[in-house]
């Protein structure tokens, strides 16, 4: 385009800038000592302070008549500007102690107190603790001589931790500028605040059993129970009270419990060749125990989720699709009682029993080593996880949104056309509703990493009198995925798929040298 092309004075120009600085100061003191050669102690005291500050501005104007006039001041029409700043800080004091008796019994404890600027002045400090104990059964007199048992440990722990991850300043009542009423500039109340905001707390309990055999096979079992209380949530409130329709509060109780299993071992191990396999699997159950003010259910209208006491917080709340009426091509749904109807009603939504957070997940891998050559592969999988495919909803919407662009070819080939057609795509002209037909199983199996490397033998490197290690390697990530999900990638970070970029395939070649 010519530099002075006519644009009828519709050009725009903007300038923006932002700066952020994060300062962290940490001081620790550590003391180790032993008594009678059998009691070992390790004590640490510490303090940490964190301060974050950011500020920025933006200026925007309209009416530039040439692309050579790039300054904001060259605009002939009204400009708009905005600036912002944000700060938060933490202050922490902590201590940790460890005890070891003859490498048979181990104990540890920790205690910390933290202050966050994100809470009201009377609730900024939170105190958290942990206790742990481990019994090294293998070191007992009756097991230490058993050569076939290389590891036997039992561990238990309990403790609390805190969470303060909410936006800055939400404990404050704020006003904002830029308001205009009857051509008079002024301020308006933009946030109601809550000086009672404080730390969210999680109480965690763990049990672990670790076994090893013949110095080549290892098993691990862990069970846990976590209870989170005083959760930081946006609680709905009347607009007449807050002006926003919600307020941040400490409410509710949520529980998670589950198990984790892992195993690895050398199937074959000789001087020159080793074949190792490993696998892990975990199961987690999430349940909401309490909400707020005696409320037992709350609908999150933007996510298709409904928080119901006794259910998972990631369970979908949707209408159930019953297919297409073969006589006339109309959409059908199940009502709340399971009867088929051609009316779509919000009141017929039900808890589906399907969740975004997968209860089952795990991985497995194998590696081969022959002299300096090594090949390894790592897989990951997720089971029984569901995601709303929002792309499919739009691609099969027909005329729902007033346009028929970018539609799936299923609307052409698979839709209902005449009485007697059996299909799940309704006749043309039906208004598509967001229901559980678009709730897809996003379980998958993925090859996360494949690597091949070769290390030159030491006998050759010694002759160079220069290199102590030379390793040539190549690796690939995310080579393939097995899934029934219709989107580009089942491993999305939210419960709604909206054409997010899939995990990229990555290939790496390299040489590692040591001198």
Indicate residue ranges for each PLM-predicted region:
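N-terminal hydrophobic signal/anchor transmembrane helix of membrane proteins
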Residues: 91-95, 216-220, 360, 402-405, ...
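Short, flexible active-site loops
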Residues: 347-348, 360-361, 373, 431-436
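Extracellular/periplasmic, surface-exposed regions of secreted and cell-surface proteins
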Residues: 1, 5-309, 371, 434, ...
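Short, positively charged
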Residues: 72, 339-343, 426-428
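Glycine-rich, aromatic-lined ligand/substrate-binding cores of catalytic
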Residues: 355-388
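Conserved small-residue
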Residues: 249, 268-356, 387, 396
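Extracytoplasmic gating/loop element in the C-terminal half of outer-membrane beta-barrel translocons
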Residues: 116, 382-471
């Amino acid at each position: 385009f010519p530099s002075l092309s006519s644009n009828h004075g519709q050009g725009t120009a903007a300038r923006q800038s932002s700066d952020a600085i994060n300062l962290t100061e940490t001081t620790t003191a550590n003391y180790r000592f032993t008594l009678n050669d059998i009691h070992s102690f390790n004590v640490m005291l510490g303090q940490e302070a964190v301060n974050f500050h950011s500020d920025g501005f933006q200026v925007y104007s309209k009416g530039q008549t040439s692309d050579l006039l790039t300054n904001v001041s060259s605009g002939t029409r009204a400009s708009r500007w905005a600036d912002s700043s944000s700060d938060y800080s933490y202050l922490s004091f902590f201590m940790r102690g460890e005890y070891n008796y003859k490498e048979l019994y181990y104990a540890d404890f920790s205690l910390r107190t933290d202050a966050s600027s994100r809470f009201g002045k009377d609730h900024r400090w939170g105190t958290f603790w942990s206790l742990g104990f481990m019994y090294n059964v293998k070191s007992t007199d009756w097991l230490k001589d058993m050569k076939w048992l290389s590891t036997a440990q039992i561990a238990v722990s309990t403790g609390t931790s805190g969470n303060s991850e909410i936006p800055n300043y939400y404990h404050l009542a704020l006003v904002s500028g830029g308001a205009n009423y009857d051509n008079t500039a002024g301020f308006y109340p933009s946030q109601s605040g809550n000086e009672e905001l404080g730390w969210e707390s999680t109480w965690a309990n763990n049990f672990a059993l670790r076994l090893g055999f013949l110095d080549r096979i290892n098993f691990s079992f862990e069970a846990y129970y976590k209870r989170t209380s005083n959760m930081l949530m946006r609680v709905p409130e009347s607009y007449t009270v807050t002006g926003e329709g919600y307020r941040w509060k400490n409410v509710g109780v949520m529980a998670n419990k589950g198990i984790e299993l892992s195993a690895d071992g050398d199937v074959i191990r000789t001087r020159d060749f080793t074949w190792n396999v490993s696998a892990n699997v975990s199961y987690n159950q999430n349940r909401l125990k309490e909400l707020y003010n005696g409320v037992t259910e709350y609908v999150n209208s933007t996510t298709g989720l409904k928080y119901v006491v006794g259910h998972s917080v990631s369970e979908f709340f949707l209408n159930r699709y019953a297919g297409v009426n073969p006589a006339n091509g109309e959409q059908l749904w199940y009502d709340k009682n399971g009867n088929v109807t051609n009316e779509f009603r919000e009141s017929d939504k039900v808890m589906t029993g399907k969740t975004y957070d997968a209860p089952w997940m795990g991985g497995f891998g194998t590696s081969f080593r022959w002299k300096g050559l090594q090949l390894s592969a790592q897989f990951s999988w997720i089971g029984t996880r569901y995601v709303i495919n929002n792309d499919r909803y739009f691609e099969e919407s027909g005329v729902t949104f007033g346009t028929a662009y970018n539609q799936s070819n299923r609307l052409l080939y698979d839709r209902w056309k005449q009485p007697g057609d059996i299909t799940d795509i309704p006749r043309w002209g039906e208004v598509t509703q967001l229901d559980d037909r678009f709730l897809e199983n996003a379980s998958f199996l993925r090859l996360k990493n494949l690597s091949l490397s070769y290390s030159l033998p030491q006998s050759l490197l010694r002759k160079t009198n220069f290199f102590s290690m030379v390793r040539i390697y190549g690796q690939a990530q995310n080579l393939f995925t097995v899934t029934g999900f219709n989107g580009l990638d089942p491993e999305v970070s939210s419960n709604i798929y909206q054409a997010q970029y899939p995990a990229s395939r990555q290939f790496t070649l390299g040489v590692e040298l040591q001198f």
